[in-house]
Amino acid sequence: MLQRFYDEGLAQASFLVGCDRTGQAVVVDPRRDVAIYAAAARQAGATLVAAIETHVHADFVSGARELAETGVRVLTGPGADLEYTHHQVRDGETLAVGEVTLTFLHTPGHTPEHVCLLAEAAGQPARLFTGDLLFVGGVGRPDLLGEAQTRQLAQQLFDSLARVMAMDGAIEVHPGHGAGSLCGAGIGKEPSSTIGRERAQNAMLQYDDRDAFVRAVLADIPATPPYFARMKRVNKAGAPLVDPSRKLPALRPAAAAALAADGALILDLRPAQAFAAGHPYGAINIGYGAKVGYWAGWVVPPDLPLILLADEPAQAQEAAVQLLRVGLDRVEGAIAGGFDAWVGASLPVAEIPQITAHDLRAAIDRGEPMHVVDVRTPAEFRGGHVDHAVNIPAGEIPARAGELPRDAPIVTICEGGYRSSLAASLLAQEGIAPLANVTGGMAAYRAAKEVTT
């Protein structure tokens, strides 16, 4: 029995692993909305007997405590020291799940307590669940516990990877993250691999010298969202128990406005163009889709009450679940009737002026004063950008808005308009004006061959 559950927004994988004959199963690295695992187990005629944490996660809220409350046993690596009932396994310890034998391998490096899980059963391929140690095309980052531990963890990462690479090349590799995750660099899109394939093709596994590996892995560290440190604390303590299926309250526009006046933040989930044309004053724009939780984790303070504005109630409901996955629990409700109802109630509205790539180029050629802020990643920026643009990735805008001069209009640009709309809304919150966002983004610039490299 093997079923993979994948959160596209956080690029996070969890697994249901078990024995078809005896109907026993475990969950590996569960996310917070745990009902999906119970439902999958029921459908398979199985009973959940354990939740296994490969490590204390930094990028999402674990569902292990939720499962513990239902009587499921929680297993972790040595030294995890969770603040709720759990069992810390020893290196080499085994767990029988029906006719499937699970062997725990202590593999420090990404974190000190990290374990991999080897699943073996007669007539089945051996499978290694590698958590954040080994990815398809990449390896885990060793820096999330702070500078003082980074070098030692990087050295341990090398040793743990060497141990895993000495295993049978036919063993399947099932990592905890896919492309887009910030838990490692260079992660591929494929959901799984094999030891042999990674041994041959993974660039980070071609180092025979530990010091050379350490230099390489530390030279390619992804950005670190500010919510990562908070997630570590939440997962160590055990996340507060919540009901992800709770129906969001429908807030009358006037009630939502009153909450906003008292400090609540309105998250406008509509597309960038709709947001630009008009939105509740003070709202920020995180367009509905798989990345709502990801971007909110970057830019939303954790204890702030939130109000959602969406085109459809179902979008607000799904967004609220995504927010729970990154520990943003204080969603007060969704605005009933959406933006039309807000306007109909004569409540304050703001706009974000838009400018096309062609008009921006013309303004630059005329020498009009402006500051272009490219909110893509540094790697994207290095691949080509607008003349004289400065690079501040969208997620860093709240911390770095003060770096921007106020002597000329600010113009935000990204690849297609999603991130730059978020950035523009954050800058508007800071009172920065005049302000404009580039429609079509760098895609339009490339089409017009207007790029500086």
Where do the protein language model's features map onto the residues?
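Divalent metal-coordination and catalytic microenvironments
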Residues: 17, 29, 55, 67, ...
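Conserved beta-strand hairpin/beta-sheet module of binuclear metal-dependent hydrolase folds
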Residues: 1-47, 117-131, 137
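Active-site metal-binding loops of divalent metal-dependent hydrolases
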Residues: 30-31, 56, 79, 110-111, ...
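Core dinuclear metal-dependent hydrolase active-site scaffold
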Residues: 2-5, 15-16, 94-123, 249-252
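Rhodanese-like catalytic fold shared by cysteine-dependent sulfurtransferases
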Residues: 141-143, 197-239, 244-245, 264, ...
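Active-site neighborhood of phospho(di)ester-bond hydrolases with catalytic His/Asp-centered motifs
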Residues: 28, 48-57, 73-79, 106-109, ...
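Active-site metal-binding motif and surrounding structural segment of the metallo-beta-lactamase
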Residues: 32-75
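Divalent-metal (often Zn2+) His-rich catalytic cores of metallo-beta-lactamase-fold enzymes
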Residues: 126-127, 137, 151-244
